[in-house]
């Protein structure tokens, strides 16, 4: 009986630990970005140690091609319930960096960039 109890506790502990370290729902996802309603680029989001980054992997803009491979989202962290904060997003064409909050809802990622008293919102679609 003691062996059964120890085995059960060990399995439960391993299961709980693996759930705690499960990847974020944004990890390894690809998103179509939009600017003023028009498709602009494609960003791949990855997670490492609880921190999300987003890299530009494609663009519809001829002048934006030079920015492919650029990390535009840095330091974003999950707050729970599909909400994210603490990161930054950079517009590589304007060379401006904004504080970032985001909200994941199904196949939509609503982002809001803040620069001083100003803010700008975009909704990206999961590819």
Can you say where each PLM-predicted feature lies in the sequence?
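Short, exposed beta-strand-loop hairpins at the edges of beta-sheets
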Residues: 92-121
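Central antiparallel beta-sheet cores of small beta-barrel/beta-sandwich binding domains
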Residues: 25-99
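Absolute protein N-terminus
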Residues: 1, 22-24
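Short beta-strand-to-coil "C-cap" segments at the C-terminal boundary of structured domains/repeats
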Residues: 123-127
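Bacterial N-terminal signal peptides that target proteins for export
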Residues: 1-10
